[in-house]
């Protein structure tokens, strides 16, 4: 999960400025629904910037939750062709809060139309038993990604990659 570390009030202020600049859609919504134009813009960006394996044959459609404010669509870049984060650098500095939030909104919107990541998950369980105590099972899982899918667009710098060792049953 990507976090910018902003407080909600600050985030809404930044989003309000992006909305007033015409860069994002209305931000006071919890809808996850995208318009047909937004889906097309996302899929166009994917086909122009990623391999064909990153674009599913059909659009990914998400329905709103029961209590969602369905009057508005999801927060997303505005327009029928999105301004890319790189294009936004002509008017906003890379370290500006507006740029950071816009990039998050752009990447999340586009990633919602990409194929899933694929990987191999390995789980190691260690059972500790002692006659004086009850048994305890420790478990750890790790995934080796074989295809990045949407993860090729959304990369969390804080996410650490650590491969689990190959162990056989009864290894100590």
Regions found by a protein language model. Give the residues of each.
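Core catalytic DNA strand-manipulation module of type IA topoisomerases
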Residues: 1-172
